Regions:
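Conserved "ABC signature" C-loop
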Residues: 141-183, 279-282
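ABC-family ATPase nucleotide-binding domain "signature/switch" substructure
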Residues: 148-151, 180-275
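A hydrophobic transmembrane-helix motif
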Residues: 1-23
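Helix-to-loop junction immediately C-terminal to a conserved catalytic motif
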Residues: 117
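C-terminal boundary and immediately downstream tail of ABC-type ATPase nucleotide-binding domains
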Residues: 48, 275-287
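Cytosolic ends of transmembrane helices, especially the final helix of ABC transmembrane type-1 domains
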Residues: 17, 23-51
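The feature captures the beta-strand-to-loop junction immediately N-terminal to the Walker
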Residues: 102-104
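Primarily ABC-family ATPase nucleotide-binding module
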Residues: 52-97, 126-129, 232
Length: 287
């Protein structure tokens, strides 16, 4: 957090390193009992080192702030020794609009967000983004040992009004900003951890907000509240990955992308996709 506040790297970049560090530590705890974890630890450690050493200019993204879009142009991507996830994938996300991405498990939804973040280098094509520091909320987020305030601010300065607004947004107004978060956030529930992470993203997001299954650990009341607040972010570009097809929520999106095995099989508004009675219709009816 101190390095972040001094401008060495962004808060978003810092949290990516924290997430990988926590994964590395978790593997260390079980290494004595499970030798197989050694391979996982080695891979995570190598990836962590690459991320720390990696310069911003080395990200596999073309940043063009005057483009007002996030554009995939004939993108192909896959992991080594595995079948490609995306082949000649093209789509344009316009600045200021809200997009939902749905599809079966393994369809490439989360990978698409990671490509926007520049986590992976693509094999072909190019990705253009208007935002050099998009913010992501993941399905499982990590908090570090410190106060809730410190976890929200990450070394940056925010007014009390901004903090209050973010906490109301994530429905955590009942928590004390000075409450201490223990190691591994053991004194908080999974839902509280996720809502603190959502509040943190609200504080740090300037333009592009990426959401990856962010309500999976929340109860129905908090889910409805936060989904409603996400929709009301009129000054943000939202790309929202979900496996839950909630009619009330998805009706508010400008466009819904339906992925299957890395392919965009259809897209459009909620009503248009239902009326076609194709892939989206069957996802909705069979959930």
């Amino acid at each position: 957090a101190i390095l972040s506040s001094n401008g060495y790297f962004s808060a978003t970049y810092f949290m990516s390193v924290v997430t990988l560090s926590n994964n590395f530590i978790d593997c260390l705890y079980t290494m004595a009992s499970y030798y197989g974890n050694f391979v996982a630890i080695k891979g995570i450690n190598e990836r962590l080192i690459r991320m720390i050493d990696k310069k911003e200019t080395e990200k596999p993204l073309l940043i063009s702030e005057d483009q007002n879009k996030v554009c995939f142009e004939h993108v192909s991507f896959g992991f080594p020794n595995k079948e490609s996830i995306f082949k000649d994938f093209s789509f344009q996300f316009d600045k200021g609009k809200k997009y939902a991405i749905v599809g079966d498990s393994g369809s490439g939804k989360s990978t698409l967000l990671k490509l926007i973040l520049g986590y992976y280098s693509i094999q072909k094509g190019r990705i253009i983004s208007f935002d050099k520091e998009p913010v992501i909320i993941r399905q499982e987020e990590h908090l570090f040992s410190g106060t809730i305030r410190e976890n929200l601010c990450l070394g940056e300065k925010f007014s009390e009004e901004d903090l209050k607004s973010a906490m109301e947004f994530a429905n955590i107004s009942d928590l004390d900003l000075n409450q201490f978060v223990s190691e591994d956030a053991g004194n908080l529930s999974g839902g509280q951890i996720q809502r603190i992470s959502i509040a943190r993203a609200k504080l740090h997001c300037h333009n592009l907000l990426l959401c990856d299954e962010i309500t999976s650990s929340l109860d129905s009341i908090n889910t409805e509240k936060i989904e409603s607040n996400i929709i009301e972010l009129t000054d943000k570009t939202i790309i929202y990955v979900t496996h839950k097809i909630h009619k009330k929520m998805l009706q508010e999106f400008d466009d819904i992308l339906v992925l299957s095995h890395g392919k965009l099989v259809e897209h459009g508004s909620f009503e248009d996709l239902l009326s076609k009675k194709n892939y989206f219709y069957h996802l909705f009816m069979n959930q």
